[in-house]
Amino acid sequence: PICSFEDFEKGSRKALLVMATGSGKTRVAISLVDVLTKADWAKNILFLADRTALVNQAKKNFVNLLPSLTTCNLCENKEDPEVSRMIFSTYPTMMNAIDETRSKDGNRLFTPGHFDLIILDESHRSIYNKYKDIFDYFDALLIGLTATPKDSIGANTYSIFDLETGVPTYAYEYETA
């Protein structure tokens, strides 16, 4: 079983899930969003990926499986982020959106408390010093997803999730898959 929800119940605010390519990382993320929104643990969700193609693919999968969830892809700039419960973005787009996106009343839309849950896709790639500011800025539960084997993930990635190096919250690797 994925233990991150249990960890959140115990007070942890971060989880790193290491799962083999093709084993369903996005599906797990969708299930977690479903459970956390139904439990009223997460009202607004941010999904971050390092490439626009991953953002687009993830949004498509979320919309297919959670059709009642209002979504916005900041990379496409078509939907209104103010009325969307789930925002999809690349890291650079989100960095700009924090300062530039305004609510209808002219205030900053993406305040530190705006998101309750942040999902980082392929988090081993995304943990650059310049993007760590996003995780520090928002006060939200943080779930990282990666297919990189746990022994190949850098120590700085584990430290972002407050984990011991080599010990992710959950691992479902090639040997198991």
Give the location of each predicted region.
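RecA-like P-loop NTPase motor core of helicase/translocase proteins
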Residues: 1-177
